[in-house]
Amino acid sequence: MKIDLNADLGEGCGDDAALLGLVSSANIACGWHAGDADTMRRTVLLALEKGVAIGAHPGFPDRENFGRSEMRLPMEAARAGLLYQLGALDAIVRAEGGALRHVKPHGALYNQAAREPELAAVLARAIRDFNPALRAVGLAGGCFIDACRAEGLEVWQEGFADRGYRADGSLVPRGLPGALLQDDSAMLAQAEDMALRQTVAAVNGLRIPARVDTLCLHGDGEHALRFARLLRERLEALGVEICAD
């Protein structure tokens, strides 16, 4: 059995270099919600040094709220914004001798694409038009996954060890009770359920399907690096191979 571990990096928080030693995929901020040309290049170089798969982590143009505020962009603007961010990171990756492997939207863009079919379709089409070989990463069971499949893209469904789930498979919004798991044992158990049993317990107690290919390790929490080590050790002890292939 194998699974990918991914982390959102180049966002100016957390120890990116240390996390890159624990994950198999890196989602690099493309300058809109966080990051700039310098942080993109530095993170790309670190990822190449560690042999970690490089992906784009595009978001809304919302630095003030770290890309976590919902926005209602015209669909053409959403397409143009995604292409702009993909192009910026791709240019740096290629210039440094690497290859862009995947795309994972950030924050509100991620969540809206998971539940809004029109936005999901626009993003999926833009990714296909930019590079049909790119893998799309999104919330397991969400609209974005369906839209990317419809465009012929390879998809990876993502799960979260540190986020609460609603019974419909969506994430509990940040700021609401149950949105964030804090206890190491609870987070490890949730990750193990998703990786080995393809299920997750929703906040109402209902066990729901969670067919995931990759688990996200958030790098901005107080104990993020320590938990990342714990999770990797637990999965490897259970015989799970950590890889991006």
UniProtKB/Swiss-Prot annotation:
GO terms for molecular function: 5-oxoprolinase (ATP-hydrolyzing) activity; ATP binding. Its EC number is 3.5.2.9. Gene3D superfamilies: Glycoside hydrolase/deacetylase. Disulfide bonds: none annotated. The keyword Hydrolase applies. It comes from the Bacteria. One of its GO terms (biological process) is carbohydrate metabolic process. Coiled coil: none annotated. InterPro entries: Glyco_hydro/deAcase_b/a-brl, LamB/YcsF/PxpA-like. Keywords: ATP-binding, Hydrolase, Nucleotide-binding. It catalyses: 5-oxo-L-proline + ATP + 2 H2O = L-glutamate + ADP + phosphate + H(+). Belongs to the LamB/PxpA family. NCBIfam families: PRK05406.1-3 (NF003814), PRK05406.1-4 (NF003815), PRK05406.1-5 (NF003816). Catalyzes the cleavage of 5-oxoproline to form L-glutamate coupled to the hydrolysis of ATP to ADP and inorganic phosphate. Forms a complex composed of PxpA, PxpB and PxpC. This is 5-oxoprolinase subunit A.
